[in-house]
């Protein structure tokens, strides 16, 4: 085992240990997704959990025992694992630090290798190579997540992936998500599918009147002040670029 954990543990130290150790144990089968992908792409957005997709598996029960076994390698770790219908949730507490690991499974997922780079160095450890969900697939899922939840956090993540990471959404993945919408919002929960054309209208309407004050009220706890300044117009420009791509296929 080459993954190291300094004690007393810190939250970022736990994140890094999980990323490095999972890469050692599960190799290309453990794929990081969600907010930690943005963190590895140098996003300043804070995150309190780390999301994984394990491939190629058909059931979370196939991985739960191995995940717990790996986490118990940490001396005196407090581990709580729950299996939900849509995910496996593992709480990990070491010393005074705690993180949450959320995982689900899939038979396939487009991935790319990524160095833990600056994040690892910020914790005082050398970089290692991990697997992350392809940024284009991540962007497609983030657009779909915004559509179902309407959170400004998701809109920021779309902006970051498109403008700062240079990703274009995987339209096949997005179309699959739009074809089986699952929203709990009152105005959307009865809607089970959406066209790209309507999604574009919803995105443009949401960003047309977006202000820095709106973003600050929701994102001040997870973004530094220098990232919030002028963010509304940056998101608006990015969303306009995304919608142009979404409308590129005239059949949708």
Pin down the residues of each PLM region.
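Structured mid-to-C-terminal alpha-helical surface segments
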Residues: 1-31, 38-50, 54-252
């Amino acid at each position: 085992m080459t993954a190291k954990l300094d004690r007393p543990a810190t939250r970022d130290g736990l994140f890094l240990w999980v990323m490095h150790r999972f890469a050692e144990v599960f190799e290309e089968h453990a794929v990081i997704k969600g907010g930690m992908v943005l963190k590895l792409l140098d996003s300043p957005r804070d995150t309190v959990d780390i999301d994984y997709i394990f491939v190629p598996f058909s059931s979370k029960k196939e991985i739960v025992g191995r995940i717990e076994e790996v986490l118990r390698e940490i001396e005196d770790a407090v581990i709580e694992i729950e299996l939900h219908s849509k995910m496996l949730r593992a709480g990990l507490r070491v010393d005074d630090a705690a993180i949450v690991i959320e995982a689900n499974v899939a038979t396939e997922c487009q991935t790319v290798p990524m160095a833990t780079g600056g994040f690892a160095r910020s914790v005082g450890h050398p970089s290692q190579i991990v697997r992350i969900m392809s940024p284009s697939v991540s962007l497609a899922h983030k657009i779909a997540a915004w559509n179902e939840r309407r959170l400004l956090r998701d809109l920021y993540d779309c902006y970051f992936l498109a403008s700062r990471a240079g990703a274009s959404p995987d339209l096949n993945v997005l179309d699959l998500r739009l074809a089986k919408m699952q929203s709990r919002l009152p105005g959307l929960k009865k809607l089970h599918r959406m066209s790209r054309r309507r999604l574009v209208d919803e995105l443009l309407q949401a960003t047309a009147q977006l202000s820095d004050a709106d973003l600050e009220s929701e994102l001040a706890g997870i973004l530094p002040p220098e990232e919030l300044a002028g963010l509304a117009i940056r998101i608006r420009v990015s969303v306009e670029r995304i919608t142009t791509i979404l409308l590129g296929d005239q059949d949708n």
